[in-house]
Every structure is written in C-alpha cells, then in structure tokens.
C-alpha cells in the first residue's frame, strides 16, 4: 500500500489528486497538503479585481470535495521537504511520511525583482485572491476618483 502525497492544493494539485486516485489501487492512499482549508479558483481572480465577482464566489472548502473521492486533505501546509527520509515537515512542526511525492505548489511571486512592482510598489497583482481583492479595492477607488 503506497501513500502518495500531493503538496499543493491549487490548480495543479487538486486535479492531480483526482487523476491519481483513478489510477491507483484501492489500497493506496492519497493526501493533499495545502496552506489552509480553502481552494481558490485562480482563473477568476481578474473578475474579483474588477469587482465582477466576490471572493466567496470563487472559493470553497477543499476537504469535503476531496474526501468525497476518498482523498485525505491536510490544511497545515509544508515547511520543509526531507527527501532522504521521504518525509514532510508541516508548518506546525509535525511530520508526514510518504512513498511518493507530487510537488504542485505553484509559483513563488518575486515582486522585489522589478523595482516598483507588487503590493508595496505601484502595481497590483491578481496572482492570489488576496491580491485580487486589494486590486478590486484600488480599482473601485480609481473609478470613484479617476484623477
């Protein structure tokens, strides 16, 4: 019996877990490890940024949908990978063993690479729903007072 862990619960990790579940044996286990309990549908972030959608329209709890297919969900997030031990160190200090690991964590944003870019600069991002909400607030402010 193998334990497959999918690190990341976004647009890569969630479909990967569903597809792997269909291919593995009934004895094999799959666990998805995400940062928090909520799945965000990233392709709709631009709609949040222009206030055509609200955050709650594009997010839902991940665990119930995965569990319905027999996939475990852990919202604690990964702090470190220990490949020599086939083990993850979770953000709360506990560990999780795996036989196979899929890394589907998405991008690491590097706003500091370009001067003036990002939330502390002169631009707005829609890469994460938190960014899209802030961009929507800025857009609303601009619409009310375009200068």
What is the predicted function of each stretch?
Residues 91, 104-105, 113:
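Short, well-ordered coil/turn residues at beta-beta hairpins
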Residues 13, 80, 96, 108-109:
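Glycine-rich nucleotide phosphate-binding loop and flanking beta-alpha elements
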Residues 91-100:
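Core beta-strand elements of the Rossmann-like FAD/NAD(P) dinucleotide-binding domain
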Residues 74-86:
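A conserved short coil-to-beta-strand element within the FAD-binding core of flavoproteins
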Residues 2-72, 117:
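Beta1-alpha1 glycine-rich phosphate/pyrophosphate-binding loop at the start
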Residues 1-30, 109-113, 119-120, 125-147:
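Rossmann-like dinucleotide/flavin-binding elements
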